[in-house]
Design a protein with these regions (language model features):
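N-terminal signal peptide c-region/cleavage motif recognized by signal peptidases
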Residues: 25-27
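Sec-dependent signal peptide recognition
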Residues: 13-19
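Short, surface-exposed loop or secondary-structure junction motifs
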Residues: 67-70, 74, 126-227
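Short active-site loop at a secondary-structure junction
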Residues: 48-56, 76-136, 167-181
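Short, conserved catalytic-motif segment at the N-terminal edge
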Residues: 33-87, 109-111, 156-165
């Protein structure tokens, strides 16, 4: 499996990408060579500044996709980034979780106003009274931590973690970004379907969107493309 690379984009990176999008959108009659020039002029300095070992960029212009790649997916093996390289989605996965929750709402399986305990009755601690799926989806449950602790290894550990959590403020009053919040929302949103989270994501989001090379668990034949 290719080595993993963790990179947190800063304000400069976000500003640069915005500039790329604006420049491309302003080029009403941009030819492929112009698009190539715009992308390389924008991205190449960024790669050098941020010391990014490998990167892929896709631009859709007038309905046509353009793909650009730089560097290595695996530095040790000198394996280059290609159009088939698989990158971890990171926090973009939260967008997919939101879409999956929206699909469950559209099917009439859940409502955002539903209490969390409706889908996890074992969550009996009093602090969960009044916390809804909406609070979980919008990070407003009361200050859930950024991550689920590493020592949580089983479903009973997970229940204990949420049972012992103590909110810092009332639900719906403040927002705090937390993987343990949106993650729980996704897990509960699929419960009425009887599907696992992975099954629901595959059949209700990935397949309808024709995301045929997007997985939660990369299948062994595709691991050679993993960055």
């Amino acid at each position: 499996m290719a080595g993993r690379f963790v990179w947190k984009p800063d304000l400069m990176f976000k500003t640069t990408l915005c500039a790329l999008l604006i420049t491309a959108s302003c080029s009403t009659f941009a030819a492929p060579q112009q698009i190539n020039d715009i992308v390389h002029r924008t991205i190449t300095p960024l790669i050098e500044q941020q010391k990014i070992p490998g990167m892929a960029v896709a631009v859709i212009y007038q309905g046509k996709p353009y793909y650009f790649t730089w560097g290595y997916a695996d530095i040790a093996k000198k394996q280059p980034v290609t159009q088939q390289t698989l990158f971890e989605l990171g926090s973009v996965s939260k967008t997919f979780t939101g879409v999956l929750g929206g699909d469950a709402i559209a099917r009439g399986e859940i409502k955002l106003s539903d209490p969390t305990t409706k889908y996890w009755p074992e969550l009996t601690a009093k602090q969960w009274n009044g916390i809804t799926l909406l609070h979980l989806a919008t990070y407003t449950a009361g200050g859930l931590p950024l991550q689920v602790p590493d020592e949580v290894k089983s479903s009973s550990d997970l229940l204990r973690f949420y049972q012992n959590w103590q909110p810092a403020w009332a639900p719906g009053t403040q927002r705090l970004y937390a993987n343990s919040s949106i993650g729980l929302f996704g897990a509960l949103a699929v419960k009425p379907s009887g599907l696992s989270f992975e099954q629901a994501m595959k059949t209700r989001v990935f397949q309808p969107l024709k995301l045929n090379h997007t997985w939660i668990n990369v299948p062994p034949p595709e691991e050679k493309n993993y960055a």
